[in-house]
UniProtKB/Swiss-Prot annotation:
Mutagenesis or variant effect for residue 321 to K: Changes the specificity for binding motifs in promoters. Recognizes the PITX1 consensus DNA-binding sites and triggers the expression of a gene pattern similar to PITX1
Subcellular location as annotated: Nucleus
Sequence similarity: Belongs to the Abd-B homeobox family.
Organism in which the protein naturally occurs: Mus musculus
Gene3D superfamilies assigned to the protein according to its UniProt record, in alphabetical order: Homeodomain-like (1.10.10.60)
Primary localization: nucleus
Name this polypeptide is given: Homeobox protein Hox-D13
Record has DNA-binding as a keyword: yes
A single cellular component GO annotation: nucleoplasm
Length: 339
């Protein structure tokens, strides 16, 4: 059997030093009774060491195990046997890995108690298409005892188990040097315990249309404004409407209804119907003469009347329609009076 296979078999036994077979090489070491070695890493063989060096190595391993709050079985026996041993070959202990990156066994996680002074907790959450991991200090209201005792622990009114995986929080610990940097990584919005971090590069805008009432302005009033140029590089300028001709058009609202603009004062808007413009006496005389000849007009007659009265063809057509309705009303009133 090879040297590595012998050490693996000795590491699997509970009492590897007493019942284990001796290595094939002459430079093999003697394991203490009750000692359990890790079989995942090959042992490191050293040369002739003094008893003082062996005791120092064992003390360093015990201190590392005590700092990580997880003692491997056989640590005390290894310390005692190494201090009194003077053999030529000494097994160097494997350096401890960071505790925050190791996942303890399920049995050890269930039985081992959490350290009382654990500075922060680690958790992960899904946001969008990615998975983010954060660390949260105990100052935001989340404690290990509350998580272990109550399955419905809440954070600011929201269930913790819905947003975080709290299965491994009891046995996990974080180095103390990561607390100041990690505590600021967690930020909650409205409804959580602490407000979000303010970003100075953005401006908090306040909504001005909070009442829910729609704006019914038909036109935009620019009275009192001077001509100005936009700061974004636009070359066009905006002037008051008083300086523009009558043919200029304005922005209109999307609300239905007949809305007209008062021409003398272009900057002041008003609602309602367009002001009625009465026809002149000459226009009415020409229209009445044509109506006396024929109550209905054709296309040629409409064009001729429009040219004579300086009215549009649509105005001529509407006037003839209204004139026929007026005759019907007069006839109906006469019938009512006679009857």
């Amino acid at each position: 059997m090879s040297r590595s296979g012998t050490w693996d078999m000795d590491g699997l036994r509970a009492d590897g030093g007493a019942a284990g077979a001796a290595p094939a090489s002459s430079s093999s070491s003697v394991a203490a009774p009750g000692q359990c070695r890790g079989f995942l890493s090959a042992p490191v063989f050293a040369g002739t060491h003094s008893g003082r060096a062996a005791a120092a190595a064992a003390a360093a391993a015990a201190a590392a195990a005590a700092a990580s709050s997880f003692a491997y079985p056989g640590t005390s026996e290894r310390t005692g046997s190494s201090s009194s041993s003077s053999s030529s070959a000494v097994i160097a202990t494997r350096p401890e890995a960071p505790v925050a990156k190791e996942c303890p066994a399920p049995a050890a996680a269930a039985t081992a108690a959490a350290p009382p002074g654990a500075p922060a907790l680690g958790y992960g959450y899904h946001f969008g298409n990615g998975y983010y991991s954060c660390r949260m200090s105990h100052g935001v209201g989340l404690q290990q005892n509350a998580l272990k005792s109550s399955p419905h622990a809440s954070l600011g009114g929201f269930p913790v188990e819905k947003y975080m995986d709290v299965s491994g929080l009891a046995s996990s610990s974080v180095p103390t040097n990561e607390v100041p940097a990690r505590a600021k990584e967690v930020s909650f919005y409205q409804g959580y315990t602490s407000p979000y971090q303010h970003v100075p590069g953005y401006i908090d805008m306040v909504s001005t249309f909070g009442s829910g009432e729609p704006r019914h302005e038909a036109y935009i009033s620019m009275e009192g404004y001077q001509s100005w140029t936009l700061a974004n590089g636009w070359n066009s300028q905006v002037y008051c409407a008083k300086d523009q001709p009558q043919g200029s058009h304005f922005w209109k609202s999307s609300f239905p209804g007949d809305v007209a603009l008062n021409q003398p004062d272009m900057c002041v808007y008003r609602r309602g119907r367009k002001k009625r413009v009465p026809y002149t006496k000459l226009q009415l005389k020409e229209l009445e003469n044509e109506y006396a000849i024929n109550k209905f007009i054709n296309k040629d007659k409409r064009r001729r009347i429009s040219a004579a009265t300086n009215l549009s063809e649509r105005q001529v057509t509407i006037w003839f329609q209204n004139r026929r309705v007026k005759d019907k009303k007069i006839v109906s009133k006469l019938k009512d009076t006679v009857s």
